[in-house]
Amino acid sequence: MFLIMLKGHILMDAPTPWGIFFQDSASPQMEGIMELHNNIMFYLAIILFTVTWMMITIIRNFVAKKSPIAHKYMNHGTLIELIWTITPAFILILIAFPSFKLLYLMDEVMDPSLVVYAEGHQWYWSYQYPDFTNEDNEFIEFDSYIVPESDLEEGQFRMLEVDNRVIIPELTHTAFVISADVIHSYACPSLGIKADAYPGRLNQASVYINGPGTFFGQCSEICGILHSSMNIAIQSVSIKDFLLWLRDQMEG
């Protein structure tokens, strides 16, 4: 019954009240993060059960009333010491190799088909598409502000919706180049993106979105009084729709 009650709160396309676990994955990076998390939780569950069982057994059986005379082999045991040294080391190796593999895969930026500059300000994001220019030979760029609660339309998310979403094509290697006026952090959970933004320094994050959709994120570094207003909305569309959007931006 408990699992049935939680079913609707475990995997979500967007944040919901009282939601737990991860949002639905929409990129290979996020799928890898979720798989690593689930594997580690499996190891932790086994460790928790084993240690709890051993502690309860020791407390119940090795007390002064039941065993007034200490066992002569309990002061030192080479075998048990080898077991509790080698076993944790082996478990850490099982966790470390997939973790390092995922870390380097996320750090390696493929040759991107699209580059988007994202710059953090107090307290909004501005975006630029350096590969495309409009009729005045200016880069396509815009600012993205939070939509006030009073201006929300039906179906929009409170404290997440923005006035200008980032539009990128699905099934396309995209690189986000990130900078900031003060320290920010560009994070979008469904896509597995989280990159710190520092003044005077460029950081980079890559993403490959599996399908169309809208994915929300927020600044993950406390950056001032309106930190909670630095929302991120990335909309993935088909390549055809992306080209139509680009045409409108170039002409407009």
UniProtKB/Swiss-Prot annotation:
GO BP of this protein: ATP synthesis coupled electron transport
Recorded catalytic activity of this chain's protein: 4 Fe(II)-[cytochrome c] + O2 + 8 H(+)(in) = 4 Fe(III)-[cytochrome c] + 2 H2O + 4 H(+)(out)
Record's keyword terms, sorted: Copper, Electron transport, Magnesium, Membrane, Metal-binding, Mitochondrion, Mitochondrion inner membrane, Respiratory chain, Translocase, Transmembrane, Transmembrane helix, Transport
Cofactor comment text: Binds a dinuclear copper A center per subunit.
Binding site for Cu cation A2: C219, E221, C223, H227
Topological relation to the membrane, as annotated: Multi-pass membrane protein
Transmembrane segments: 40-59, 82-105
Enzyme Commission number(s): 7.1.1.9
Mitochondrial intermembrane side of membrane: 1-39, 106-252
Top-level enzyme category: translocase
Localization: Mitochondrion inner membrane
Database matches in Pfam families: COX2, COX2_TM
Superkingdom, natural source: Eukaryota
Listed CDD domains: CcO_II_C
GO cellular component, one term: mitochondrial inner membrane
Cofactor: Cu cation
Recorded GO MF terms: copper ion binding; cytochrome-c oxidase activity
Residue sites binding Cu cation A1 per the record: H184, C219, C223, M230
Mitochondrial matrix side: 60-81
Function of the protein: Component of the cytochrome c oxidase, the last enzyme in the mitochondrial electron transport chain which drives oxidative phosphorylation. The respiratory chain contains 3 multisubunit complexes succinate dehydrogenase (complex II, CII), ubiquinol-cytochrome c oxidoreductase (cytochrome b-c1 complex, complex III, CIII) and cytochrome c oxidase (complex IV, CIV), that cooperate to transfer electrons derived from NADH and succinate to molecular oxygen, creating an electrochemical gradient over the inner membrane that drives transmembrane transport and the ATP synthase.
Family: Belongs to the cytochrome c oxidase subunit 2 family.
Complex formation: Component of the cytochrome c oxidase (complex IV, CIV), a multisubunit enzyme composed of a catalytic core of 3 subunits and several supernumerary subunits. The complex exists as a monomer or a dimer and forms supercomplexes (SCs) in the inner mitochondrial membrane with ubiquinol-cytochrome c oxidoreductase (cytochrome b-c1 complex, complex III, CIII).
Identification of the protein by name: Cytochrome c oxidase subunit 2
The organism of origin for this protein: Emericella nidulans
